[in-house]
Design a protein with these regions (language model features):
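Left-handed beta-helix
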Residues: 197-344
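Conserved N-terminal catalytic core of the sugar/cofactor nucleotidyltransferase
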Residues: 8-11, 15-18, 23-120, 137, ...
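Short beta-strand segments
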Residues: 1-2, 50, 101-104, 134-138, ...
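Conserved core of the sugar-phosphate nucleotidyltransferase
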Residues: 112-235, 253, 326
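A residue-level structural signature of the nucleotidyltransferase/glycosyltransferase Rossmann-like core
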Residues: 48, 100, 168, 187, ...
Length: 344
């Protein structure tokens, strides 16, 4: 799924080239890194990119080895449940018994081999039973940025290298006190937003809980579906797959991820993955610092010089500059309504 806006990464992230289409952490975009990672488990012809009309050309350019037909543009922004319904419908017409894997294009996972191995085991579980499978990340701190899921009893399919549990419940992003309690309990995982199901399993759950999504899947044409998608997709309810399906589904299993994971949610995520100088500054581009500490500085064209400052985020592009305190990184998206259209 590659249709997000990435507004917290402005000014590098824009409407047509958001976070997953920007080389934030290296030479490749996050979308290309995601596709390369999935190719450890699946052949390229089975990988589809769900995006939108504003981003589809840039997505195709980022992953040129995938055929253009494997990039699907959603005609309207309807959140993740309709996106999952669209992806399920596309795969269902190719193979009614197939297992579909949905994953975000903008998460960072470096251990591709472990990821691929667990993905294959999760796919086998989803194929065998009418169960939806999701990945959970064991938290190492009480984050309030993620949704959580509570794990119950271990499943018979569980192994030391790939633990499976019954998913008891999904919970929204908690406050600090609840997050601390979740961490202390040892029963809660961060929701990684990675889901697997057989097409028939998703359809049955949609029939019970989201009949509009079920009807969309059932009426999906076998031939050219572009006109159908353009007409029907914008009418679907705007709702996340967590609320629409995952919280209500009869059987959900959670896999404890044994690979590294970071959703790279804002500028403050970069220091964990990029080199730091002696002052703890994270620097990309031509940057000079003097008496400055703990800054994140990205220069994409001009020279940036910092003197006697700390805890700043400074990002320079050809047509815009961001300066903010590190503590305000989560609020960068709130600039969007106030920015000129030409730099959004």
């Amino acid at each position: 799924m590659a249709g997000g806006s990435g507004e917290r990464f402005w000014p590098l992230s824009r409407v047509a080239t958001p976070k997953h289409l920007v080389p934030l952490l290296g030479a490749r975009t996050m979308l290309e890194e995601t596709v390369r990672r999935v190719e450890h488990a699946l052949p390229a012809e089975q990988i589809f990119v769900l995006t939108n009309a504003a981003q589809i050309d840039a997505c195709r350019a980022a992953v040129p080895h995938l055929p253009p037909a494997q990039f699907i543009a959603e005609p309207a922004k309807r959140d993740t449940a309709p996106a999952c319904a669209l992806g399920t419908a596309l795969v269902r017409r190719l193979d009614p018994d197939a297992v579909v894997v949905f994953l975000p294009a903008d998460a960072l996972i470096k251990d591709a081999a472990t990821f691929a191995g667990q993905l294959q085991k999760a796919s086998a579980l989803a194929a065998k039973d009418d169960v939806i499978v999701t990945f959970g990340i064991r938290p190492d701190h009480p984050s309030t940025r993620f949704g959580y899921l509570e794990a119950g009893a271990a499943l018979p399919e569980s192994t030391a290298g790939c633990p499976f549990f019954h998913a008891e419940r999904f919970v929204e992003k908690p406050d600090a006190a609840r997050a601390a309690g979740y961490l202390a309990s040892g029963r809660f995982f961060w929701n990684a937003g990675i889901f697997l199901w057989r097409t028939g399993t998703f359809l049955r759950e949609a029939q019970k809980h989201q009949p509009d999504l079920a009807a969309f899947i059932e009426a999906f044409p076998k031939g050219d579906a572009s006109a159908y998608i353009a007409k029907e997709f914008p009418t679907l309810p705007k709702i996340s797959v967590d609320y629409a399906i995952m919280e209500k589904a009869a059987r959900v299993a959670v896999v404890e991820a044994r690979f590294d994971w970071d959703d790279v949610g804002s500028w403050t995520a970069l220091p964990a993955h990029l080199p730091l100088d002696a002052g703890g500054n994270t620097i990309q581009g031509t940057v000079t610092v003097h008496g400055s500490e703990n800054n994140i500085v990205i220069a994409r064209g001009r020279v940036i010089a910092l003197c006697g400052v700390r805890d700043l985020i400074v990002v320079e592009t050809e047509d815009a500059i961001l300066v903010c305190h590190r503590d305000s990184a989560e609020h960068v998206k709130q600039l969007q309504p106030h920015l000129p259209d030409k730099v959004r």
